[in-house]
């Protein structure tokens, strides 16, 4: 279980609490600059929180424990920095998401899909996210098109 209890991060996020169990998806929504990606970075242990706590399966996420927890997570960023020769944003993003879903990790953290994705690509994203949920993974995503189980910032 992923739990956030009264999490505060900078000026963007104040006293956010939520819980996510195995086989559940939560979609983070909000306007530009509202802290969506900041929250994902805190869940990954990349940035510290200013208040409250985050726990995974009852264990607190701290700067010391973050590397351990990241081994249980798969992260798909919004924008990819790819080697020269990779030109198709959509297929690269879909390949990275497929790898994350197939990794068997217990927690998938998926930032907003690139704007370049087609309607068909977005359906593939939705299908892969639901596949991960059905497998029992916890999925935290930022996706303005995926309307199930939203948390607005």
Predicted regions and their residues:
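Short loop immediately C-terminal to the Walker-B catalytic DE motif
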Residues: 114-117
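Conserved ABC transporter NBD signature motif
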Residues: 52-60, 69
């Amino acid at each position: 279980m992923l739990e956030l209890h009264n999490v505060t991060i900078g000026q963007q996020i104040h006293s956010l609490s939520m819980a996510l169990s195995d086989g559940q998806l939560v979609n983070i929504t909000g306007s530009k600059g509202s802290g969506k990606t900041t929250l994902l970075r805190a869940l990954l242990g990349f940035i510290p929180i200013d208040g409250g706590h985050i726990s995974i399966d009852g264990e607190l996420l701290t700067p010391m424990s973050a590397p351990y927890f990241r081994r249980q997570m798969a992260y798909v960023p919004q924008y990819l920095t790819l080697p020269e020769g990779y030109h198709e944003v959509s297929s690269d993003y879909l390949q990275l998401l497929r790898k994350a879903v197939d990794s068997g990790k217990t927690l998938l953290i998926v930032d907003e899909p690139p704007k370049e994705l087609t309607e068909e690509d977005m359906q593939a994203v939705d299908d892969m996210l639901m596949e991960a949920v059905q497998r029992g993974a916890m999925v935290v995503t930022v996706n303005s098109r995926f309307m199930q189980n939203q948390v607005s910032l």
